[in-house]
Amino acid sequence: MFTISDLHVKADDKEILKGFNLTINEAETHILMGPNGAGKSTVCKSILHHPHYEITSGHISYQGKDLTNSLTDEVAKSGIYYINQTPVEVEGIKNMELFRTALMAKGEKVDIFSFKKKCNAICEKLKMDPSFLTRNVNEGMSGGERKKNELFGMWLLKPSLILLDEVDSGLDVDAIKIVAANLKEYQKETGASLLVITHQPSLIEKLEPDHVHVIKDGKILLDGDKDLAFDTLNNGFSSLSWAGVMTDGSQNE
């Protein structure tokens, strides 16, 4: 179980998350939506302890371990994997070197023969040319190629909780299908949980979320299922009745 309890986070002396709460159980898919500036990306970056964001109070825990004050690499080693909307280029580092080093950081013994065999199988699954392994990380890659690169890391490193921040950004219809299909297949095989920040109807439909949350002013104000997502996308955030709505969807008398 992954839990965020009463999380308060600030950046540049401005409070962004103001009592954020979230619980994700094994194999669940959660969609997080909200207006611009509501704090969606801050949630993911706070989990990972991005240096720009300061947790001032609250708790983050995963599988019984308190991650509130953990270092980023400790969060990653706990089984949490992050895919953001703009994966960065890393000059001078080959994909193969990065992924092999990441496996070794988990304590796995990696011989080059079995590693290449595993990589080729993942490339086939993602319909990727294996030559990408000899390219520098994300260098000269399109948006779709970069997202596939991130999915490659998911299949290789086998995380149990995946955070996806606008993973559909810059992708065409076919690329979104590939992303969704891989996430569903991976979840079915491993029982992993997903926290997905998106406003893309086709991705939401394909992922079949268990829960949809709408965040505003740094906290979740509405919870529901995928109907909430589509109502919001069809009518806009301004159509939602925020006042008096509890996070279980009931009315506050």
At which residue positions do the language-model features occur?
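Q-loop/switch helix immediately C-terminal to the Walker
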Residues: 86, 92-106, 118
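The feature captures the beta-strand-to-loop junction immediately N-terminal to the Walker
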Residues: 33-35
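Conserved structural motif at the start of ABC-family nucleotide-binding domains
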Residues: 2-4, 17-19
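ABC ATPase NBD coupling module
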Residues: 66-81, 232-234
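Conserved beta-strand-loop-alpha-helix hinge in the C-terminal portion
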Residues: 215, 219-242
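Walker B catalytic motif
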Residues: 166-168, 174
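Conserved ABC transporter NBD signature motif
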Residues: 56-65
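ABC ATPase C-loop
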Residues: 154-155
